[in-house]
Regions:
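Short, acidic, metal-binding catalytic loop of nucleotide-sugar glycosyltransferases
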Residues: 9-19
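A conserved acidic beta->alpha catalytic loop
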Residues: 10, 26-35, 51
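Glycine-rich, basic loop-to-helix element that forms the pyrophosphate-binding segment
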Residues: 48-66, 87
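Short aromatic/hydrophobic "clamp" motif used to bind/position activated sugar donors
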Residues: 71
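Conserved donor NDP-sugar-binding/catalytic core segment of glycosyltransferases
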Residues: 79-115
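Short, flexible, basic/aromatic active-site loop/helix in glycosyltransferases
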Residues: 120-159
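A short, conserved alpha-helix in the catalytic core of glycosyltransferases
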Residues: 152-211
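Active-site-adjacent helix/loop segment of glycosyltransferases
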Residues: 192-271
Length: 271
């Protein structure tokens, strides 16, 4: 709960010059948040679910009771800089083609998190990433496409995929795409949303000049369920967006996902 409190303090500080609201959607956590947070954070709106409804559905819940022109979806293990929100809003106002923006995420040691900017999981990009080739050629435009390794981490650029850990989106755009696809329980929903935003003709911008701290995995337990959810989401994405491709194309993707899932399961005892 301390992690979430630090997140809320940073958001409140970043909103000092912004007319906005903070909404917390709790997916049936058991850390005492329901009992203690409302009394500590006056003015924050809370939704407490009786069961874990998944990331996508929780985000949609929060968006429905929000009222701003921009909606920020933020993981609870994040800490914002004081100018982060105003800088993002300013970018939107000078880039009318922007549908959503993400930022440069750093871990608690200041290390850049590669998932801050990504490409779509095409067969080649997925193969290079899943089997470690990307790590050998981390700045190749072709081989490192999954993490957009050819784009400098501290520059602003349009990218194919933004991270759901920090995604600010225009309300009008979010409503046009009908929000997050709730078929994605956990993982993959940000890839799906990013793609649907671009299909409407808007751009997803990675803002490398704006940084936040993201305690990657702060609310994640690495176990079989995590592996199953993660690779299940990848298969769902393939089924939804690549169903018009050839059978061989889809078989290749599903085979790669299945092999990587098996390897991840085998590696669990060594994490």
């Amino acid at each position: 709960m301390e992690v979430l409190e630090n997140c809320l303090f940073s958001v409140q500080k970043a909103m000092q010059t912004i007319d906005g609201e903070i909404i917390i959607v709790d997916n049936n956590s058991n850390d005492g948040s329901k009992e203690s947070l409302p009394s500590k954070f006056w003015g924050v709106k809370f939704i407490f679910n009786n069961e874990n409804l998944g990331f996508a559905k929780a985000c949609n819940q929060g968006s429905k009771i929000s009222s701003g022109d921009f909606i920020l979806f933020l993981n609870p293990d994040s800490v914002l800089s004081e100018t982060c929100l105003t800088d993002c809003v300013s970018f939107f106002k000078t880039h009318q083609d922007a549908g959503a923006v993400g930022v440069r995420m750093l871990d608690d040691k200041g290390k850049f998190l590669k998932e801050s900017k990504r490409g779509l999981p095409s067969p080649s990009a997925s193969f290079y990433k899943l089997f470690g080739v990307t790590a050998i050629f981390p700045v190749s435009k072709t081989i490192a496409k999954y993490y957009q390794g050819h784009l400098p981490e501290n520059e602003n650029n349009p990218v194919e995929v933004l991270s759901g850990a920090f995604m600010m989106i225009k309300r009008a755009v979010f409503e046009k795409v009908n929000g997050f696809d709730e078929a994605f329980f956990l993982y993959g929903e940000d890839i799906d949303l990013s793609l649907r935003i671009s299909q409407l003709g808007y751009k997803n911008y990675y803002l490398g000049k704006i940084s936040i701290m993201h305690l990657k995995g702060g609310s994640t337990t690495y176990n079989y369920k995590y592996v199953d959810d993660f690779y299940g989401a990848m298969k769902l994405f393939v089924k939804k967006h690549y169903n018009d491709k050839s059978t061989l194309y889809r078989l290749f993707l599903h085979a790669g996902i299945s092999v990587r899932k098996m390897l991840s399961i085998l590696a669990l005892p060594f994490r």
